Amino acid sequence: ALEYQYVMKNPKQLSFEKFSRRLSAKAFSVKKLLTNDDLSNDIHRGYLLLQGKSLDGLLETMIQEVKEIFESRLLKLTDWNTARVFDFCSSLVFEITFTTIYGKILAANKKQIISELRDDFLKFDDHFPYLVSDIPIQLLRNAEFMQKKIIKCLTPEKVAQMQRRSEIVQERQEMLKKYYGHEEFEIGAHHLGLLWASLANTIPAMFWAMYYLLQHPEAMEVLRDEIDSFLQSTGQKKGPGISVHFTREQLDSLVCLESAILEVLRLCSYSSIIREVQEDMDFSSESRSYRLRKGDFVAVFPPMIHNDPEVFDAPKDFRFDRFVEDGKKKTTFFKGGKKLKSYIIPFGLGTSKCPGRYFAINEMKLLVIILLTYFDLEVIDTKPIGLNHSRMFLGIQHPDSDISFRYKAKSWRS
């Protein structure tokens, strides 16, 4: 379980780059990356716009989008409404993420456009495990159709019509024009890759966050208390409209909320860290030695740590406060008597670490805060939900079925 440290120490001999480029070519029809190092480097530089001050700007936009979506629709629902958790999460996460990153659609039928794009995206995502397999795309007719349909919605001409596009999308548009000129479809393929990366794991992760919180009312209560204490300490009042505001630092200060999100990711993330061997080599770890040939793949599987009872007591259980100790973030976990440097690894490591991880976690935190602050939530189905392992090694697992819950906006008259 600790051998990922040895894999990370050999970045030149064990490379993520070629594997990543082939995956982009197959899944998103991004072909030029296979042969163009400068393009790859420019794309990676663009990911800096998902950190620091640029991330603060994205969070501001996201808060505005959340406010508009909830106030125009969900906050008006003062009677109990029933919904399916996965449907509810996919609808919310898709619209908030899309409008935060790509901007607002100005067309009169924007609701219909967003709804259709979401349905198309979910169909495309259902095919994703097949797209990254060795099956030729020509045999995956539906997947290829959905891929092309979404790309045509994300061409530079279409994206330029969006209002309030994020910095990363604007910069990406300009940078891609440098390489592709007027090849609209090729640039749209890159946008599909960005859209998929921003949604494919956040949607199921948000499902699991809601699922576990609905199953554990005691966790909801503690998180509500933490959020209420924060709002009081910053002089913010809850009322009929969404007036609460958070900076990135303030979101990070909510230790119970962060712990609950990390615990969700620990339980449902089954991503792997994959590297391609660049030259014949001997690879030694603490426990054994291996002879690796050029072209072999090495995979490290973080769930071995996430589910190790020596690292996490009762690893199958959801414990929302697992990452809290004495009111602060708990960061000390041990294996074989040694303190682990990395004990929760849902986003990969090294060069393959997800550049949008802060964006995704902030989005989940914000949605949990709004749902717990402004709504009463109750589970209807109490049946346990399992993981659907069709995305093994590819990230957050989808549930094997959906469950119903009910919700209503809280009354503020009192």
From Swiss-Prot:
Primary localization class, coarse: endoplasmic reticulum
Tissue specificity: Highly expressed in brain; also expressed in liver and kidney.
Pfam families: p450
Positions in coiled-coil regions: none
Entry keyword set: Cholesterol metabolism, Endoplasmic reticulum, Heme, Iron, Lipid metabolism, Membrane, Metal-binding, Microsome, Monooxygenase, Oxidoreductase, Steroid metabolism, Sterol metabolism
Topology of the protein relative to the lipid bilayer: Peripheral membrane protein
Domain of life: Eukaryota
Assigned EC number: 1.14.14.29
Residues at which heme binds: C354
Pathway recorded for this protein: Lipid metabolism; bile acid biosynthesis
Its biological purpose: Oxysterol 7alpha-hydroxylase that mediates formation of 7-alpha,25-dihydroxycholesterol (7-alpha,25-OHC) from 25-hydroxycholesterol. Plays a key role in cell positioning and movement in lymphoid tissues: 7-alpha,25-dihydroxycholesterol (7-alpha,25-OHC) acts as a ligand for the G protein-coupled receptor GPR183/EBI2, a chemotactic receptor for a number of lymphoid cells.
Name of the featured protein: 25-hydroxycholesterol 7-alpha-hydroxylase
Organism: Rattus norvegicus
